[in-house]
Regions:
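Short, functional N-terminal and low-complexity linear motifs
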Residues: 1, 6, 131-135
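Extracellular jelly-roll beta-sandwich "head" domains, especially the C-terminal globular C1q domain
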Residues: 44-197
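Glycine-rich, low-complexity segments
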Residues: 2-69, 194-197
Length: 197
């Protein structure tokens, strides 16, 4: 079929892939002609944001995984995107592959504790856990109910949602309380999908 340029400016007879290399450049593409299906990496923008917290205070000494009492922050409909994170026994699963910024934060009270910290732990095989980030505060004071706040970040490249997972762990020299609540963010996670894997 011959290629025909019609009087109204339309073209008929042109097959898919029929234009040679360099015929169409970026400047000639209409502003609304590129869909997210054709975009890649961070060009799509942020596609997912999700925030989770513990709902009750966790009291422990030494190292301990935050394995219960998690809920999504439901006060401000904070989840962006159709699919957010899922959680089971403190282990968080990502909805899709991609590059994620993981932010963990903890609010603790202690009594003469030299250090109280949190770790972002990651696994790439679903079973072996290693530290991705850690941060510490201190409640080294002779009085009781000394407060400490810790915030850490980790950039996680998720290539397999079945094996790449995240969890939160505490590390304290003595017994301290990591505060949780149902109506305010005190101890928990924020997950932001920054781009494609």
């Amino acid at each position: 079929m011959p290629v025909t340029i019609n009087g109204n400016g339309s073209i008929t007879g042109l097959s898919v892939g029929g234009l040679g290399s360099g015929v169409v450049n970026t400047a000639s593409i209409a502003d609304g002609a590129v869909t997210t299906d054709k975009a890649s990496g961070s060009v799509k923008g942020i596609e997912m944001v999700d925030q989770w917290r513990i709902t009750s205070t966790k009291s422990n000494s030494g190292q301990s995984v935050f394995d219960s009492n998690w809920e999504r922050n439901d006060l401000n409909s904070n989840k962006i995107g159709s699919a957010g994170m899922s959680e089971s026994s403190g282990v968080f699963t990502f909805p899709t592959t991609g590059k994620y910024l993981v932010i963990a934060f903890g609010y603790a009270t202690g009594n003469n504790d030299r250090y109280m910290g949190i770790w972002i732990e990651r696994t790439a095989d679903g079973s072996n856990w290693t530290r991705g980030a850690e941060g510490y505060g201190s409640a080294y004071n002779s009085g009781s109910n000394t407060f400490s706040q810790v915030s850490i970040q980790y950039f996680f490249h998720v290539t397999n949602t079945s094996t790449h997972k995240i969890r939160l762990k505490s590390d304290n020299v003595g017994t301290c309380n990591w505060d949780g609540a149902q109506d305010i963010m005190r101890t928990g996670f924020t997950f932001i999908r920054m781009g494609d894997a």
